[in-house]
From Swiss-Prot:
Binding site for Zn(2+): H15, E18, H108
The protein's name in its UniProt record: N-acyl-aromatic-L-amino acid amidohydrolase (carboxylate-forming)
The organism of origin for this protein: Xenopus laevis (African clawed frog)
Subunit structure: Homotetramer.
UniProt xrefs under NCBIfam families: PRK02259.1 (NF002601)
Gene: acy3
Length: 305
C-alpha cells in the first residue's frame, strides 16, 4: 500500500535543446489548467532556463548528472558551475530528496529511435504501475512503449528525477536536438496527461492488480572504436542504425570503417541495444547502451488508508 500522491512536478528543459519538454513546460507555465486533477494540481518546472534560452543541452555541465548527494550538500562556492547552482535551487524548492515530493515526471527527447521509453529506478513498483498503465492506455505503433530500468544504488542517484519519492523520465525519439516534431510533441502531451490521470485514479482509490513487467536492464555502455589519438575510427553500421530495442546477435555488424570494413558484435550472448548513435552521448564516448530483456513480478498497488 502507498499513501496518496499530493505533490507532483512535471519537468521540461532539463536539457535545453530537447524541445518537446521545453515547449510543453513553457505552455503549461502560461496555462496550467491541463495539469489540474481532482486530487492535486501538478507543478511545472523549466529546469535549465539559460540552456533553454540558448537552445543547448547545458551551459557548464549536464544538469541531469548534478543531483548527487555530494554536490547538493557541498558548501556553495563562486567557482560552482551554473548547473550545480541550479540543482541546489531545485533542491531548496523541492528537497530533501524523496520526502514531500511524491512524483517527478521529467521530459526528454533523444535522437535515437527509442519510441516511448519510460526510465525509472529499479525497485520503484509505483512507477512500474504507472509505466504499465501508459503501455496499456497509450498504444501507438509509431511510438511503442519500452521500460528501461536505472539500476544503481540510491546513493549513486544523480538524475533530477531522483528528487521524487517516485519518478519516471519520458524519453521520446527520434527527434533532432533543437527541433520540434509535432508528432513527438503530441505524443508526449498525451503521455503526461495519462500519467496525471493514473495518479489521480490512484488517489481516488482505484486498485491496480499485480502484473508481470517486461523491462530492459543495462548491461554496459559501448564506445566507438578509437585510435591511439582518441579519434573515432568507425561509426554505427547502417544495419544497426535505428534498431533500438531489437535483438543484436553475436556476429551482427555494429560499426563500419571509412574503408567499408565492418566490425561485428563479438559478445557471447544476445543483447538489445538502446540509445544507438545518440547525438548527446558522443561527448560521453557512448555509441550505444547494451541491455538485456527481463521479466519481473510487480505486486498489486492500492491506496493506504
Amino acid at each position: 500500500m502507498s499513501p496518496p500522491v499530493s505533490q507532483v512536478v512535471v519537468v521540461g528543459g532539463t536539457h535545453g535543446n530537447e524541445m518537446s519538454g521545453v515547449c510543453l513546460a513553457k505552455h503549461w507555465l502560461q496555462d496550467p489548467s491541463e495539469l489540474r486533477r481532482k486530487s492535486f494540481t501538478a507543478d511545472i518546472l523549466l529546469a535549465n532556463p539559460i540552456a533553454v534560452e540558448r537552445c543547448v543541452r547545458y551551459i557548464d555541465r549536464d544538469l541531469n548528472r548534478s543531483f548527487s548527494h555530494e554536490l547538493l550538500s557541498a558548501s556553495a562556492s563562486e567557482s560552482d558551475s551554473y548547473e550545480v547552482k541550479r540543482a541546489r535551487e531545485i533542491y531548496q524548492k523541492y528537497g530533501p530528496k524523496q520526502s514531500s515530493l511524491n512524483f517527478v515526471i521529467d521530459l526528454h527527447n533523444t535522437t535515437s529511435n527509442m519510441g516511448t521509453t519510460i526510465l525509472l529506478f529499479k525497485g520503484d513498483n509505483f512507477a512500474l504501475h504507472l509505466a504499465n498503465y501508459l503501455k496499456t492506455k497509450c498504444v501507438d505503433p509509431s511510438f511503442p512503449c519500452h521500460i528501461l530500468l536505472i539500476d544503481i544504488p540510491e546513493q549513486g542517484h544523480v538524475h533530477l528525477q531522483s528528487m521524487g519519492k517516485h519518478s519516471i523520465s519520458l524519453e521520446l525519439g527520434p527527434q533532432p536536438q533543437g527541433v520540434v516534431r509535432t508528432d513527438v510533441l503530441a505524443r508526449m502531451k498525451v503521455l503526461v496527461n495519462s500519467s496525471l490521470d493514473f495518479l489521480d485514479l490512484f488517489n481516488q482509490g482505484t486498485e491496480f492488480p499485480s502484473f508481470e513487467a517486461e523491462v530492459h536492464q543495462v548491461l554496459h555502455k559501448a564506445d566507438f572504436p578509437r585510435g591511439a589519438d582518441g579519434e573515432i575510427q568507425a561509426f554505427i553500421h547502417s544495419e544497426l542504425q535505428d534498431k533500438d530495442y531489437l535483438p543484436l546477435k553475436p556476429g551482427d555488424p555494429i560499426f563500419q570503417r571509412l574503408n567499408g570494413d565492418d566490425i561485428l558484435y563479438n559478445g557471447e550472448k544476445l543483447i538489445y541495444p538502446v540509445f544507438i548513435n545518440e547525438s548527446a552521448y558522443y561527448e560521453k564516448k557512448v555509441a550505444f547502451i547494451a541491455t538485456e530483456k527481463k521479466h519481473c513480478f510487480v505486486p498489486a498497488l492500492k491506496l493506504q488508508n
